[in-house]
């Protein structure tokens, strides 16, 4: 049996930056000040549970913070202006781990609003990134999730529209929605697919290639990870059997019956250790050869850690 690894896979620069910010902060203030994170630092169960064991306190609301002398970290997904203001009023020190690519969308949305445009956001309703983007502007943003939403859209002035997108969407689905928006509203302006993060696009392109050369795809990632779910959707859309699993223990041996080539990838918030554990588990159970797909993309993007850390 052959294992073929997608390239790239796993951590993106924004996730690595957020995880590093939290790790450095925890090391700096351990036994001195409590470290809080609003929501999950990234959408990965392993990462969150590991930080919990180290003493990080994850909260769902500013109200849940009991010690104002602590440090509050905003997750990689970003937050609304209202959340920022609440933290400021509480007087707690804040370190912002928002992915710079998400912050870029925040600025785009505000710039469009300041120019008088009515805003449309392509994204998933309950995702924290979407909540953050909607909360960066003063006026309501119309949310579009599907082509049907585009058909049903009611706007004030069809000639005065702009759109932005969540960074972790399917590039194929988003392209279709943008095309539909432009057909219905020819004067709409927006970034095309530039808001979708490079890492999301690279991982999706790698999985598309992977589905052509393997019999099954195993995707390491958590169920609440948007970009991991998009990898699963891509495999399914191409008729390739695929499973999204948190780690090797979720794998069912029956999945491998009659399989010669296994493709493995990982969402942008899944650490390398989980891929390594899956490979080792497979090696123990079956005779395997491991290789990396030959035409993958090497990523060299790095984001700076804020000076407060």
UniProtKB/Swiss-Prot annotation:
Pathway: Isoprenoid biosynthesis; dimethylallyl diphosphate biosynthesis; dimethylallyl diphosphate from (2E)-4-hydroxy-3-methylbutenyl diphosphate: step 1/1; Isoprenoid biosynthesis; isopentenyl diphosphate biosynthesis via DXP pathway; isopentenyl diphosphate from 1-deoxy-D-xylulose 5-phosphate: step 6/6. InterPro entries: LytB/IspH (IPR003451). The keyword Amino-acid biosynthesis does not apply. Keywords: 4Fe-4S, Iron, Iron-sulfur, Isoprene biosynthesis, Metal-binding, Oxidoreductase. It catalyses: isopentenyl diphosphate + 2 oxidized [2Fe-2S]-[ferredoxin] + H2O = (2E)-4-hydroxy-3-methylbut-2-enyl diphosphate + 2 reduced [2Fe-2S]-[ferredoxin] + 2 H(+); dimethylallyl diphosphate + 2 oxidized [2Fe-2S]-[ferredoxin] + H2O = (2E)-4-hydroxy-3-methylbut-2-enyl diphosphate + 2 reduced [2Fe-2S]-[ferredoxin] + 2 H(+). Its cofactor is [4Fe-4S] cluster. The active site is at residue 129. Signal peptide: none annotated. Dimethylallyl diphosphate binds at residues 43, 77, 127, 225-227, 269. [4Fe-4S] cluster binds at residues 12, 99, 197. The keyword Iron-sulfur applies. Belongs to the IspH family. Catalyzes the conversion of 1-hydroxy-2-methyl-2-(E)-butenyl 4-diphosphate (HMBPP) into a mixture of isopentenyl diphosphate (IPP) and dimethylallyl diphosphate (DMAPP). Acts in the terminal step of the DOXP/MEP pathway for isoprenoid precursor biosynthesis. NCBIfam families: ispH_lytB (TIGR00216), PRK01045.1-4 (NF002190). HAMAP family: IspH. This is 4-hydroxy-3-methylbut-2-enyl diphosphate reductase. The lineage of its organism: Bacteria, Pseudomonadati, Pseudomonadota, Alphaproteobacteria, Rickettsiales.
């Amino acid at each position: 049996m052959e294992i073929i690894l997608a390239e790239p896979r796993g951590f993106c620069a924004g996730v690595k930056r957020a995880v590093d910010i939290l790790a450095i902060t925890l090391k700096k203030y351990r036994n001195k000040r409590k470290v809080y994170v609003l929501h999950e630092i990234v959408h990965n169960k392993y990462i969150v549970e590991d930080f919990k064991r180290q003493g990080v306190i994850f909260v769902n609301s500013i109200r849940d913070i009991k010690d104002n002398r602590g440090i509050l970290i905003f997750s990689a997904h970003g937050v609304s202006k209202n959340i920022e203001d609440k933290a400021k009023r509480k007087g707690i020190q804040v370190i912002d781990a928002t992915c710079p690519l998400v912050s870029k969308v925040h600025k785009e949305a505000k710039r469009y609003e300041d120019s008088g445009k009515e805003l449309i956001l392509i994204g998933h309703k309950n995702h924290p990134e979407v909540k953050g983007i909607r909360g960066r502007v003063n006026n309501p943003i119309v949310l579009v999730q599907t082509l049907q939403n585009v058909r049903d859209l009611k706007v004030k002035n069809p000639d005065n529209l702009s759109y932005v997108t969540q960074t972790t969407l399917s590039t194929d689905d988003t392209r279709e929605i943008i095309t539909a928006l432009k057909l219905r509203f020819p004067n709409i302006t927006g970034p095309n697919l530039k808001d979708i993060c490079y890492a999301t696009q690279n991982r999706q392109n790698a999985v598309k290639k992977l589905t052509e050369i393997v019999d099954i795809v195993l995707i390491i990632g958590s169920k609440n990870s948007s970009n991991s779910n998009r990898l699963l959707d891509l495999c399914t859309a191409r008729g390739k059997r695929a499973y999204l699993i948190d780690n090797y223990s979720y794998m069912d041996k029956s999945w491998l019956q009659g399989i010669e080539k296994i493709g493995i990838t990982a969402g942008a918030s899944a650490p390398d250790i989980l891929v390594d554990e899956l490979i080792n588990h497979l090696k123990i159970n079956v005779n395997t050869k491991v290789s990396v797909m030959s035409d993958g993309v090497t990523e060299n993007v790095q984001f700076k850690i804020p000076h407060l850390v």
